[in-house]
Structures are given as C-alpha cells and as structure tokens.
C-alpha cells in the first residue's frame, strides 16, 4: 500500500515537471517531431524513473547506528479510535481511486471494442490508393493502420484532404502516443496535468499531420478551407472549437523550423535532475526501512529470551549463614 502511494506520488511529480518544462520550451515551437519525441519520452520516463533504486554505499566505520529499545506503551481510548478512523479513511480513498480507475479502463476498452467492431463490419474501399473503412458511426479518424472515413459527409476536394491527413496520422503511428496517454490517464486521472498532457499530445498530432499534408504539396489555402468546413459541418462552433481552428491555421501559416530540434536536448538535464531527486528519496526511505527492520529484529530477539518469574537462587550476603 505504502509502496503504491509512493510510486504514484513520484510518477505524478515527474510528469508535472516534464510537462512544465514542455510548456516553457515548446509552447511556440513549430518542430512538431521534436515536440512529439519529448512528450513520448516524458511519459515513458515518468513510468520508469520512480522504479529506479540506488544504494549509495557508505564507507565502513563512518556510520555508527545505536538502537535504543523502549518498553512498549499501549494507548487506549481516543488514540485507538483515531487510528481506526485514519485506517478507514485510507481504505475509502483507495476504493474511490480503484473505482474511478476501473471506470476509465472500461471506457478505454469500450472504445477499442467499438473500433474492432467497426473495422470488422464496415465496408472496405480503396480511395486514392489507400484502403479505408467506410463508417458513419466514427468520424474521420485512424487507429494504427485502420483509417475510418465517411465520403458522404464531404465533397471530393475536402475528402482528399481529410484522407491525406488521416493517412499521415496512420503512417506516423500517432495511435501509440494516444494509447500511452490513455493508460497514464487510467493511473493518474486525479492529476490535472495528465489531462493537459493528453490534450497537448492530440493537438501536436494535428499540427504534425497538417504540416506533412502541406509539405506533400497540398494547396495551403484550400486545405485551410477544408479544416473550416470540417468544424462548421460537424456542429455549432463553440469557443473551444474556434480556438482549435485558429491555432491549427496559425501553425499551418507558421514556418517550420527544423533547427529547433536542439530543444530536445533539454530532456537530459530534466531527466538527470528527476533521477537524482527520486534516488535520494528512495535511498532515505530504504535507510529508514532498514533501521526499522533492524529495530524490530532487536526487539524480537529480546522477547524470545527466557523470562524468569521465580528467583531460583536467593541472594546471600557475607556472614548471613551465621545468623
């Protein structure tokens, strides 16, 4: 129980620090490939770093530990009820955490099941040399090599742009990033930074796919009109959708800077700092645990010794026998 809480705490500290560095470094950067590598590394490192354990050896003779065992004191009354209350509160929080995590697991599995069913039952066609699944249930999307699209919802020019956009999603393997983000969400749904990270991954995928479409030779103005038609045709444009359209179009008009890939080197100092921080915390916890175990062994050894209730030989003083 304690180890799980420690792992979750360190995982969320790591992901928060990584994402904070991402906002500082990559907020206005247009090198989407480097941004993607950073976000992927941040997720993987956040899972792995808390698992690292280091044992920094202490030179012999420099550490002198003295264990003092005090008699056991049993507290009664209000102290006992307080301990029981604390235990029950911990159990309630654990049950709530597991319940919400189970909900997100079910939601993830339901989404994957829906994709599997649609891929098995939908009509397959070849459009512009790409094998697609015709589906009215799923909006234009991709999952690894599967591409879902509904030709009836778009004209020919928009359909070509949408198909090209989803094809680049599939080729770049964006579904792997999304799946990792969903797993992280299942574990750390209580951390708002994880929700922000998940959104940042999705947004960066859109920017990267848009950039590839433009680099492939698609007319920039007509492609931007396709983006507008997609949002206008789907629903009434809310403030959130309006910002998404604005940001995507701004990124399309922004020059792609390949030279900014050096920013990915920031992964190393952030990772080293986190490893050192986690290692120091783990070392202190291990030392405390070892000291506690040693103390328990000492107490157990004392309790296992023979206890005398009757004096076998009475003490005598010099000259007492002559009395």
Placement of each model-derived feature along the sequence:
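Charge-biased low-complexity segments
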Residues: 285-323
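Hydrophobic topogenic segments
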Residues: 2-294
């Amino acid at each position: 129980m304690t180890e799980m809480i420690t792992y979750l705490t360190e995982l969320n500290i790591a992901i928060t620090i990584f994402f904070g560095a991402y906002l500082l470094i990559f907020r206005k950067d247009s090198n989407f490939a480097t941004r993607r590598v950073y976000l992927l590394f941040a997720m993987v490192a956040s899972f792995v770093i808390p698992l690292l354990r280091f044992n920094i050896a202490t030179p012999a003779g420099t550490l002198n530990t003295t264990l003092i065992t005090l008699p056991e004191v049993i507290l009664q009354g209000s102290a006992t009820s307080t301990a029981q209350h604390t235990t029950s509160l911990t159990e309630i929080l654990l049950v709530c955490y597991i319940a919400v995590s189970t909900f997100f697991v079910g939601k993830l599995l339901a989404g994957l099941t829906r994709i599997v069913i649609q891929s098995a039952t939908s009509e397959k066609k070849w459009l512009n040399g790409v094998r697609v699944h015709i589906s009215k249930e799923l909006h234009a999307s991709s999952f690894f090599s599967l591409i879902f699209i509904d030709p009836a919802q778009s004209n020919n020019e928009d359909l070509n742009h949408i198909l090209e956009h989803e094809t680049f999603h599939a080729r770049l393997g964006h579904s792997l990033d999304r799946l990792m983000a969903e797993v992280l969400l299942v574990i750390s749904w209580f951390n708002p930074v994880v929700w922000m990270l998940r959104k940042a991954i999705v947004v960066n995928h859109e920017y990267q796919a848009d950039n590839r479409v433009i680099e492939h030779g698609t007319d920039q103005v007509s492609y931007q009109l396709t983006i507008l038609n997609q949002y206008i045709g789907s629903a009434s444009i809310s403030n959130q959708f309006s910002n998404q359209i604005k940001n995507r179009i701004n990124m399309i008009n922004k020059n792609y800077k390949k030279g900014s890939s050096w920013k990915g080197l920031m992964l190393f100092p952030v990772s080293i700092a986190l490893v050192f921080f986690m290692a120091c915390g783990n070392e202190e916890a291990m030392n405390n645990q070892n000291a506690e175990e040693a103390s328990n062994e000492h107490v157990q050894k004392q309790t296992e010794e023979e206890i005398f209730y009757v004096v076998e030989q009475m003490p005598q003083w010099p000259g007492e026998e002559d009395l």
